[in-house]
Amino acid sequence: MKQTKTKYGKMKQIVSNLKLPDYRYEQLTKAIFHQRIDNFDDMHILPKVLRMSLVNEFGKNVSSVIPVFSQDSKQAQKLLFELTDGERIEAVGLKYKQGWESFCISSQCGCGFGCRFCATGSAGFKRNLTADEITDQLLYFYFNDHRLNSISFMGMGEAFANPELFDAVKILTDQNLFGLSQRRITISTIGIIPGIQSLTQKFPQVNLAFSLHSPFESQRSDLMPINKRFPLNQVMKTLDEHIIHTGRRVFIAYIMLEGINDSKEHAEAVVGLLKNRGSWEHLYHIDLIPYNSTDKTTFKFQSSNAIKQFCSTLKKAGISATVRTQFGSEISAACGQLCYENEL
């Protein structure tokens, strides 16, 4: 028998063990996701024996992550969460015009892949998050009256390196739980080929973002050691297969590093990488990202004029490209800046 791993599976098992009718589980999930009740004792629609059993199993709160520090800017909120074993992770909430809210969540405590420009990698890898720890980050925001309009796995860690990623996505897309559309979820990867292939088969409508950062194999291997294990040419073939199978656009992230990957030669090589791939090549979209400075690395911010020139070269060649609007860099909540601290 398959072991019940997630809290929602355990909740269903508790209802069954108490020989309660199935509708009690439905009442429980509605209390969480419709009424936004975080405390089991406050779910008065449930019988006392069930509430007591839930508290004994999970503690008094539905969400297991504890916020220990919050930092806000005009459009971003960065939260430092403490987990039950004392490890810490960060998540970011972003507010856009017309009330749209997007959340960037972590999949690992730290990261072991050592991308040279990323602050998270400097912390090293501690452990994978459980599916509950991943989704509990969102529960915290939800219980605090936020709207979960879109979710991105762009926080700490490489999502495809966590075996519980797809359990988390299953929870997020379960219509009796979070009920998110697959198209409201984006998973970012540095190029873990087996993970991309699994996403293609299991959740074909989930958005996929690939971190490129250099079109040259040797330089990419220097910036991102994962390229030695999964070379760029092989990753691109896997992305082609993903597009052919799903018919969905793939977003390619390209962080602009001054004097490193911002030359005209780089722009032309990106064009060469994406052109003449096949009838699906129009479904590749480049997101140019201004580098966000951090005290963990020595790379420098690129000027807006240089980024515009790079973008212009791509567009003139027929490549779909935009310069990403950045939120949260002033509170170290933007791309590549997440790095938990024991004391903030």
UniProtKB/Swiss-Prot annotation:
Annotated ranges, domain Radical SAM core: 97-330
Record-level Gene Ontology MF annotations: 4 iron, 4 sulfur cluster binding; metal ion binding; rRNA (adenine) methyltransferase activity; rRNA binding
Species this chain originates from: Clostridium botulinum (strain Langeland / NCTC 10281 / Type F)
Binding site for [4Fe-4S] cluster: C111, C115, C118
Name this protein carries in UniProt: Ribosomal RNA large subunit methyltransferase Cfr
Cofactor field: [4Fe-4S] cluster
Family in the record: Belongs to the radical SAM superfamily. RlmN family. Cfr subfamily.
Entry GO terms, CC: cytoplasm
Enzyme class, broadest EC rank: transferase
Gene assigned in the entry: cfr
Note: Reaction proceeds by a ping-pong mechanism involving intermediate methylation of a conserved cysteine residue.
Cystine residue pairs: C104-C335
